[in-house]
């Protein structure tokens, strides 16, 4: 079994305004994989990439690199390099100078280092590990204590009915509710706004008649909110301490490696010489096909050429993970396809782990070993490109990944479905019970256009559009429109037959959470 290189464990990112950009994102990535985060704009994929790179801090969760949490590790020390959508090149530097820039801090082993120095480096690491383990053990003890306090606080909220009912109430909601009560009480009958009277009564400690229902409601609300405010402050203080432990656990987890690296930088490794920098830069320039433009400035290059420079600049520092933030989205179709092919080739030849962010389904399916489909900050489905396309786990994924035709029906028996009065075979033999309601999906390209009465159904051609390699055909069957892609031309108004293979009949669960959103 291949070892996990990167485990993004239960990552959540909530901004100050309460917006959850990423919610409980959990993904394991193996060394050398090409992984794509795919989803519509605003789904959280770019935020997730920034979290991996270190440009954003997660609210919760861990970034485990070879089992060590690096979420608090400085960007320069992470095993990643990022290729941005806008290239981010230095305009005052040539292509070669841009690529050489990252090599200024790159190091390599010194020649003829005595074996005893390596043994000392191991001692430094072991000593630091011992110290780190003690610190982490102490932090875990503190975590257990704080978690117990948080549970006690939760019980306090629950035990007091009045407090529990207003637990999520914010201050402006509280003031608004009080104002409404004062309005009911008639305290503003002198023409002054009830909201102002609230402040007046608050500071004058007005006496309330607890026999009056509204006065009693005001009294209970004030009392509950005051107690809640005290609990909130205590709760926030405890949770802050609890969350702060994440930082220190992450710090001590990386501490041994950092101490060893400091020792090695001083005693074992050295910076590259000018000659070595030149040689490495030329190697990568040749690799990405920029030899003829190495002395040009970014402003003299096309978008495709500039993106090659950005990619070369990331490759030259030899990271373990390349992060690609929609690097091809601004390019025209021909250049984009060319660079897609080159990315695929580079990945195969170099064996580096690639993590790509894109909203382009075709790009994700053609480049990736693994596709991660995202929506609303969460993972909808993870799998091989063929699995995502042919076996989506929800209507939302089915509709997002390419064109599709969806029928409502039933899984009537093992390997057999029924929809719109049609009984059809399917290669789906697990995961469904007999007569279970479900959705049946058939992709447009999986229909075979045959003569009328020679297929499984007959349909009337409503429209035909030539797309180059295929004809985009819209057919009417009963009350629904079916999309078909065929190689043979048909004419509007033709009556045709449609057929399909068992393997092309895909079955989707009907109770999946996002199905309602997809209909």
Swiss-Prot record:
PROSITE patterns: ABC_TRANSPORTER_1, ABC_TRANSPORTER_2, POTA
Annotated spans, Insert: 107-270
Gene3D superfamilies per UniProt: 2.40.50.100, P-loop containing nucleotide triphosphate hydrolases (3.40.50.300)
Any single Gene Ontology cellular-component annotation: ATP-binding cassette (ABC) transporter complex
Membrane topology note: Peripheral membrane protein
Function comment: Part of the ABC transporter complex PotABCD involved in spermidine/putrescine import. Responsible for energy coupling to the transport system.
Quaternary organization: The complex is composed of two ATP-binding proteins (PotA), two transmembrane proteins (PotB and PotC) and a solute-binding protein (PotD).
Family named by the database record: Belongs to the ABC transporter superfamily. Spermidine/putrescine importer (TC 3.A.1.11.1) family.
Protein name: Spermidine/putrescine import ATP-binding protein PotA
Organism annotation: Ureaplasma parvum serovar 3 (strain ATCC 700970)
